[in-house]
């Protein structure tokens, strides 16, 4: 299902996430091309988020203004199967707001030093986030080098910064989010339930 009036649906859910706050500091944000799928206790929304970037140039006594757009496809999952501590995971080449502005702290894994070569992980509850990011999840994330992820309560947000997905890539993009959700479910029983939800959601997304 596509909803061109995306802002009222999406913005209240994402307005506390860092990537939204960081983008909105520069310019108003536009949401478009919303696709949703829902089954039981799980809902996923995939949408494009864009904001204009203004460059002021001066050549001699003349000045001009160039405007281009920063765009990316974002996935947002809301599920009662998730109960996440607040965290954000960003690739090393991504520059967002300082974690100190959100009272967040760096989360490190002394037994897995290679992880820091791929990502920067922050959270309010370091021990809770560290327990959540077990070796299986860290390995999966390193194979997805470049993904950006935020979690909070029953919400999970993910994207590949500055990357717009083509229509032919959306099915894979859905799957990336569902796989992350499955790995972030805290117990094996939850993971099995989530896996069933994923299969149903993928089926509905194909039909939409």
Language model feature labels by segment:
Residues 3, 7-208:
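Charged, low-complexity intrinsically disordered regions
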């Amino acid at each position: 299902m596509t909803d061109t009036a995306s802002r009222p649906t999406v913005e209240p859910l994402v307005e506390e996430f860092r990537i939204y706050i960081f983008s909105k500091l520069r310019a108003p944000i536009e949401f478009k091309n919303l696709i949703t799928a829902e089954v039981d206790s799980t809902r996923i929304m995939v949408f494009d988020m864009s904001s204009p970037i203004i460059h002021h140039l001066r050549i001699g006594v003349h000045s001009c203004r160039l405007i281009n757009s920063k765009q990316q496809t974002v996935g947002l999952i809301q599920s009662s199967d998730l109960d996440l501590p607040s965290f954000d995971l960003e690739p090393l080449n991504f520059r967002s707001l300082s974690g100190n502005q959100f009272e967040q702290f760096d989360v490190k894994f002394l037994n897995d030093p290679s992880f820091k070569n791929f990502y920067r992980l922050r959270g309010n509850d370091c021990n809770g986030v560290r327990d959540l990011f077990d070796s299986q999840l860290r390995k999966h994330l390193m194979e997805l080098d470049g993904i950006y992820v935020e979690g909070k309560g029953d919400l999970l947000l993910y994207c590949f910064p500055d990357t717009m997905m083509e229509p032919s890539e959306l099915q894979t993009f859905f799957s990336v989010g569902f796989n992350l959700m499955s790995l972030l479910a805290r117990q094996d029983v939850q993971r099995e339930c989530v896996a069933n939800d994923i299969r149903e959601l993928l089926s509905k997304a194909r039909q939409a």
